[in-house]
Amino acid sequence: MPLVGLGPLMRLGTSVVLIAAALLPEGSAVAQFSPSGGAGLHAEESSEPPEPSVIEPPADAEEEEVKHDIAGFDKANLNGFFVQSRDAEFRLNIGAYTQFRYNLSWLETPPAGEDDFNSGFLFARTRIFFEGHLTKAIEYQFRLNIDDTGNFALLVAYAGYNFKDYRHQSRHNHGAWNLRVGRQFIAISREDWMFPQDLLTTEYSAVDQVSAVGAADGLQAFVGKDRGRAWLAVTNGAGGSKDDFPNNVASQVLLSARGEVQLLGDDWSVFNDLVGRRGRALGILLGVGSGYQISGPNAPPGDPKHSGQVTVDLSVGGNGFQALAYGTWSWAAVGTLQSSWGFVAQGGYFIFDPWQVYARYELVDPGNIPDLITFHALTLGTNLFPLTWTNRIKLSVEGGLLFSAVNQTLVSPNGIIGWLPADEGNQYYLRFQLQFGF
């Protein structure tokens, strides 16, 4: 039979084989070698093995390689909203919160012509944060404050350099340290070192009001190793953030230091606040802080040329509780050496999430300062935390009792701390506070 007569049969056989190959699973030997696009479309093509196919990367391949979101909200960060570069080298975090209060105050013996009862609303403070890092080593923070009268102030503005990463777990802190330059809070007292949102109570204690340095301008270095860490600072001293050049009336220079050691535990995050949320490990922290200040030539007459303080605090924190006790001794050279001291003891306990109860006792003793009496106050309250991952959202109800005539003590009366001017007798307050932000 002529070969030409087999042509239709050969073509038919070839088509059957190719159709069968197309119907086989992709992993079978025939399917692996079948042309792309389906056998029926290529029945007349050469039977030579095809060239290896090259898969072009998709147009958005660069996007698929991005490991970090360029914007979003991070619950693990104090200020959650962020914008960052694709490699996460640059990052900007933004946050804000306010403390809105309704106060009721009773005076046993009001000043002449004054009412024995006062009440009203108050925005105690509003804080706005811009913080982050330019690289993994270079950090920055800007913090604005709006006070109860609506005045704006640049509370914090610093740049920092992290020479070595710091970690919460003590066993990972092998010589971590950094340096911050600019306006910042100074590490002496643990209470004053805390953000207002992270306090146990609605407000700082009267002891803190009398002795705290607050924000100042200068340099502050930090070092952390294993279970110990320390801060060293050279700044323009107490109230230094409110001074200008050349009329610095507060101080010429303040040398300060604070050291902390964990007597029990190895997780520093237990002591990131004074609240003591549930789920934390047991820890005990001992801290010591001190400062020495030299007043400048523009200081008002009668201001001490030399002054200083020493603070010792002990904190115990664990699963749903935290307690703090500290004492501070302050001195000033005003002709003769004058000294005073203060003491704070406080503790809070979560009955259940999200409900916490707390108490605080505070004392300010004038020491050898003449014509003053001792300040005694007791505070009781409760906090409700709707969210487990932040202290920024909080509802508080708090009552306070002052056992002294505040005008005769070292403490300056004002509506923020809750004690109003009075020359005689005790006073009481009831406060409702809504703290909220993002």
Predicted regions and their residues:
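Outer-membrane beta-barrel pore domains
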Residues: 63-73, 107, 114-115, 141, ...
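Active-site cleft segment of glycoside hydrolase catalytic domains centered on the general acid/base Glu
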Residues: 245-247
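Outer membrane beta-barrel
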Residues: 80-240, 249-266, 273, 277-279, ...
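Bacterial N-terminal signal peptides
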Residues: 13-26
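N-terminal periplasmic/intermembrane-space "pro-region" immediately following the signal or transit peptide
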Residues: 27-99, 106-109, 169-173, 268-270, ...
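Low-complexity, intrinsically disordered short segments enriched for Gly/Pro and polybasic residues
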Residues: 271-273, 284
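N-terminal secretory signal peptides that target proteins for export/translocation
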Residues: 1-10
